[in-house]
């Protein structure tokens, strides 16, 4: 997804990928060794690189490597998503992997701002709601979801209200 300052993004539609864990920092989203790139091209394939390799070494599969979540457009995450250093590479890598919207319990402020600048809507839900969203995405990985920025709701197999601050919301609309 490429967004410009004038792009209207009233909603994001697609399948969702459920990522579990609090305090997932920018170093985990895109390891520091990938920050030397001159352009952001190719960063998507390295999203969560170290987490993915670590799980593969144990015979496990990271959610970003599971076939059923390939092509997902919406990311469901937990608390303090995107904490750590203020690198734009983190939301760039998610965007280039295919993520067009993120719903989490909370976001690191700079990460949130970088996402908004890139045209990636970020919405907040409470712990119980993210639990229900994770469960629904795991139960049916092929389910279609709509993050409705205008109505401040996520709709799919279940529907949950989301919080999007007025300022960022107005940038999308």
Tell what function each PLM region has:
Residues 1-173:
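Fe-S-dependent hydro-lyases/dehydratases of central metabolism
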């Amino acid at each position: 997804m490429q967004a410009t300052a004038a792009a209207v993004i009233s909603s994001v539609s697609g399948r969702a990928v459920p990522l579990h864990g609090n305090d997932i920092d920018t170093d985990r989203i895109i390891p520091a060794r990938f920050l030397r790139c001159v352009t952001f091209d190719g960063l998507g394939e390295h999203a969560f690189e170290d987490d993915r390799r670590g799980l593969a070494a144990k015979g496990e599969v990271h959610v970003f490597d599971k076939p059923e979540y390939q092509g997902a457009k919406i990311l469901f995450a937990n608390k303090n998503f995107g904490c750590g250093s203020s690198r734009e590479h983190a939301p760039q890598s998610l965007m280039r992997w295919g993520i067009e919207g993120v719903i989490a319990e909370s976001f690191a402020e700079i990460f949130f701002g970088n996402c908004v600048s890139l045209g990636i809507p970020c919405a907040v839900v409470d712990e119980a709601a993210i639990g229900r969203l994770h469960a629904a995405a795991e139960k049916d990985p092929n389910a279609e979801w709509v993050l409705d920025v205008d109505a401040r709701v996520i709709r799919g197999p279940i529907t949950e209200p989301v919080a999007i601050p007025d300022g960022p919301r107005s940038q999308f609309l």
